[in-house]
Each structure stands twice: as structure tokens, then as C-alpha cells.
Amino acid sequence: MAGGVKGIGKFFGDVVAEMKRVSWPTRKELTRYTLVVLGTVAFITVFFAVVDYGISALVRGLIE
């Protein structure tokens, strides 16, 4: 059991060491990346909404 506790401590120590080596984006880069993601999500949302509406209208037209 003691080996497990030491293993957990080593794991978190390794995590901290790895996080220090990470190349974090600047605030400007982070803002740009966030806007790209939000824009992409908005575009895909609108695209699928239009496709869904079109398919629904087509099916409604076939049913009636």
C-alpha cells in the first residue's frame, strides 16, 4: 500500500514538472484561437440548421 502512495506522489510530481515545460499560448493567441473555435461552431450550427430545415421541408412536401 505504501508503494501506491509513493506512486501517486511521483505521478503528481511528474505532472507538475510536465506542466512547467508546456508552451502556453499568449493572451492574444488564446483570444484568436477562441474566436476561431466559436466562429467555426457558429458556422457549423447554421449550416446544419439550414440542412435540417431543407430536409424537413422536403419530407413534408413528400408526405403532403
Curated annotation (Swiss-Prot):
Pfam families: SecE (PF00584). Essential subunit of the Sec protein translocation channel SecYEG. Clamps together the 2 halves of SecY. May contact the channel plug during translocation. It is found in: Cell membrane. Keywords: Cell membrane, Membrane, Protein transport, Translocation, Transmembrane, Transmembrane helix, Transport. Its main location: membrane. Gene3D superfamilies: Preprotein translocase secy subunit. One of its GO terms (cellular component) is plasma membrane. This is Protein translocase subunit SecE. The keyword Iron-sulfur does not apply. The chain crosses the membrane at residues 35-55. InterPro entries: SecE_bac, SecE_sf, Translocase_SecE/Sec61-g. One of its GO terms (biological process) is protein transport by the Sec complex. Signal peptide: none annotated. It is a single-pass membrane protein.
